[in-house]
């Protein structure tokens, strides 16, 4: 529902919005985190699209209604208590804000943009204020955890200012593994599973005299230590998103494309260490989070949005 409401705010046809919202809600990542019991992450992903919709309305539509919606949605988002998900969507919001700022400057609407920015900032302050107590104690106690760094020598899990780079990037998405977004099980299934005894892999191995070997081989051959399954967005959804990129107006699509590219590069983690090290050093707060492959949640949100843009 949150995704559908965001699409209505953007101006998508309600029926198209239903299809796009289902593409978001039925992506495999939701099923994986529900099965793993990541309830706070799930709720953060539920509220995030509405927060983005509020930001869209504030910067492009009715500024006061947008600010009110942003304050409400951001309050719920922060209250879901998964700062990592919130952080990634705020990065996407920043991409949108930068895009609007550049366009406003070119069109001579800088004063209006600054007013809308002030309203958006006020909404953010209200959202933070409504969650001040848990945020305060989280920030206070994080200094005593591995996310707060260490005054002693760096360990395998901590650095001077936050998590150690190797520890934070342990769950890095492989470059080829990114094709899981389009092709199901491109790098295999979840860790701990093996190939079926009556499958084609077993048949080929049997021809070489390796009977029973298929039941001892892992059905996942990606670069992550283990995984609950691939992040599959749907071939149809990705194809329609590509069509949306080709046909949509530039104002609507470039910031989304930029956010997707950045998030995919960040998800590669140790497989693109130069970019990851740069983000760790210079992107505020980024070194507090592990499992960098989680940045793909923004791509999961962006693909249904991109496929809807051709109807705006």
Could you tell me what each predicted segment is?
Residues 37-39, 92-95, 139-155, 278-283:
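Short secondary-structure boundary/capping segments
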Residues 2-31, 234, 238-275:
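Carboxylate/His-rich catalytic cores and anion/metal-binding grooves
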Residues 2-10, 14-104, 116-138:
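Membrane-embedded helix bundles of polyisoprenyl
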Residues 132-244:
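Periplasmic/ER-lumenal interhelical loops and adjacent helix-loop junctions
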Residues 42-51, 86, 90-91, 233-236, ...:
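Membrane-embedded alpha-helical segments of multi-pass membrane proteins
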Residues 105-118, 198, 203-215, 240-270:
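Membrane-interface helix-loop-helix junctions at transmembrane boundaries of multi-pass membrane enzymes
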Residues 30-43, 218-231, 262-302:
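Membrane-helix boundary/interfacial segments in multi-pass membrane proteins
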